[in-house]
């Protein structure tokens, strides 16, 4: 049992070590600094399923450390929650495939309201529609689940 637990921990460590940390992270931080701290906006985080759960954790953690952030469920956004999104905000859209329909639709709806809101994508697919529409794509790699 201890060997299995250690193996799981080792796999998690390897996955974290293999996350690319080139200049892209700096670009994402620049967007967040500009939108949240200089323009007094907030980070809007969204994802479906497991990606949504991760997004909720990100938004909660950022808010608790003083960086205004909220999670919006992409389906709920289409039914009234878009009013939370303001012109100085930034979007963090999370989808492992980068093809999640609701996430792509959310981007379309937000751009119709505020066409200059920057999108930061968190995805495992650099060739996806989500990666293409984003200003910054944080590629997670393809770690084993």
Language model regions located:
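An N-terminal, well-structured beta->alpha segment
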Residues: 1-41
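Glycine-rich phosphate-binding loops that contact phosphosugars or nucleotide phosphates
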Residues: 33, 42-145
């Amino acid at each position: 049992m201890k060997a299995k637990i250690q193996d799981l921990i080792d796999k998690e460590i390897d996955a974290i070590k293999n996350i690319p940390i080139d200049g892209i992270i700096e670009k994402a931080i620049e967007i967040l600094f500009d939108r949240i701290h200089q323009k007094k906006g907030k980070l809007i985080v969204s994802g479906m399923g497991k990606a949504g759960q991760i997004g909720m954790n990100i938004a909660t953690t950022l808010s608790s450390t003083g960086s205004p952030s909220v999670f919006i469920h992409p389906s709920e956004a289409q039914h009234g929650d878009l009013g939370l999104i303001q012109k100085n905000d930034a979007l963090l859209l999370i989808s492992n495939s980068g093809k999640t329909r609701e996430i792509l639709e959310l981007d379309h709806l937000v751009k119709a309201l505020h066409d200059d809101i920057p999108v930061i994508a968190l995805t495992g697919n650099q060739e996806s529609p989500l990666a293409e529409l984003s200003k910054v794509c944080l590629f997670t790699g393809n770690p084993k689940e």
